[in-house]
Amino acid sequence: MKKARMIVDKEYKIGEVDKRIYGSFIEHMGRAVYEGIYEPDHPEADEDGFRKDVQSLIKELQVPIIRYPGGNFLSGYNWEDGVGPVENRPRRLDLAWQTTETNEVGTNEFLSWAKKVNTEVNMAVNLGTRGIDAARNLVEYCNHPKGSYWSDLRRSHGYEQPYGIKTWCLGNEMDGPWQIGHKTADEYGRLAAETAKVMKWVDPSIELVACGSSNSGMPTFIDWEAKVLEHTYEHVDYISLHTYYGNRDNNLPNYLARSMDLDHFIKSVAATCDYVKAKTRSKKTINLSLDEWNVWYHSNEADKKVEPWITARPILEDIYNFEDALLVGSLLITMLQHADRVKIACLAQLVNVIAPIMTEKGGEAWRQPIFYPYMHASVYGRGESLKPLISSPKYDCSDFTDVPYVDAAVVYSEEEETLTIFAVNKAEDQMETEISLRGFESYQIAEHIVLEHQDIKATNQHNRKNVVPHSNGSSSVSENGLTAHFTPLSWNVIRLKKQS
């Protein structure tokens, strides 16, 4: 048995948790939309063709915001194709994912569906093949009440009330050579600045996300962020980060240490934002939108064999295992540790495509192992992020040194009078953890949720639910706080409630 210590103090404040860090992403890609959220012939389809069983699972996650419609798809998308009578909409080749897009689901259908699952939409505008004009028209179509061409067109389509979308993305991964309309940092920065300016003239209340690097391994990483922000700093509110992790080498200790890479990534981009703030003598602070993150590697080879140019092309259908859930938990913890700067995050994606939810055409929908840490954080991680002081045994691995076996984040809700400790034990031994609580003397343990499994590669399928959490965690109140026993390789959620 290993031992660790943790101090949780009410005054060790990181910042308020923006609920949007528990966001997700749905792209017109694979079976995310068609055969995912939308399947008119399914027994569970509602009057609009959207699957009610999928809606129920999304509601369990309490997803606050969903990025839409892409993704690489975005850079070749004409939003006008997806509005108006469905029978008049064109079928287009989506060059990003080699599919045929029917445009059955477009802006109004998706925004109406979002209301059904109680979420907001983070709408993205195409800065690949389109630009300023298409972007400002989309804002007018979505957000202007009436009396103009585009707002009245929306009303003529049967949607009288404006949507009031508050969060918008200025393109997608424009630094990537694979992107339709790929640009240099200066080219993108100028276009993004002018587009942002005009979009905010249409609706001054909106917030805008500029494209950061596609990932931290890009050769122009950091230089891209600095140049883009020098053009856009006074016109945007966030810059994006995208990152995915995998365990191709089947090296578990190294894989679980990847949360340290995310920590470094966040710090690097935040520092770059602050450098540009100083350079431009600005008084505003640009925060971060981690609007694509997840585990992604299981499906890579299988995707090469899928027939091109069909609709609902089954690609990126990663089947996640228990070790993936542990890393997703650690990545969520890392975001909470940076709640002062990370204000938006989107688990990419939500249904079928590298997703916590999987569906069968005409059949069931089910929860993958990564569903659970994401749900726990979203449901219980609302409030103020506190900085726990952790003394834990450490280990070295291929790419990292001094990796703590215990990774933890703490969220305090003054309104709900709850304290929630999220912790991952990365050790293959039980971890006895003494937790000192300062300022929470009247709090008692309400629940200790654990996600664990003897087989690190265990998966869930529609007929086999192997990886599910339980509430039989071992923790007890001690003289100065509590003692928690974290089982080997486990995700833990300890919920405490103030006693009257």
UniProtKB/Swiss-Prot annotation:
Protein EC: 3.2.1.55
Localization in the cell: Cytoplasm
pH dependence comment: Optimum pH is 8. Optimum pH is 4.5 (at 30 degrees Celsius with pNP-Araf as substrate).
Active site per UniProt: E173 (proton donor/acceptor), E292 (nucleophile)
Molecular functions per Gene Ontology: alpha-L-arabinofuranosidase activity
PANTHER family in the record: ALPHA-L-ARABINOFURANOSIDASE C, ALPHA-L-ARABINOFURANOSIDASE C-RELATED
Function of the molecule: Involved in the degradation of arabinan and is a key enzyme in the complete degradation of the plant cell wall. Catalyzes the cleavage of terminal alpha-(1->5)-arabinofuranosyl bonds in different hemicellulosic homopolysaccharides (branched and debranched arabinans). It acts preferentially on arabinotriose, arabinobiose and linear alpha-(1->5)-L-arabinan, and is much less effective on branched sugar beet arabinan.
Similarity field: Belongs to the glycosyl hydrolase 51 family.
UniProt protein name: Intracellular exo-alpha-(1->5)-L-arabinofuranosidase 1
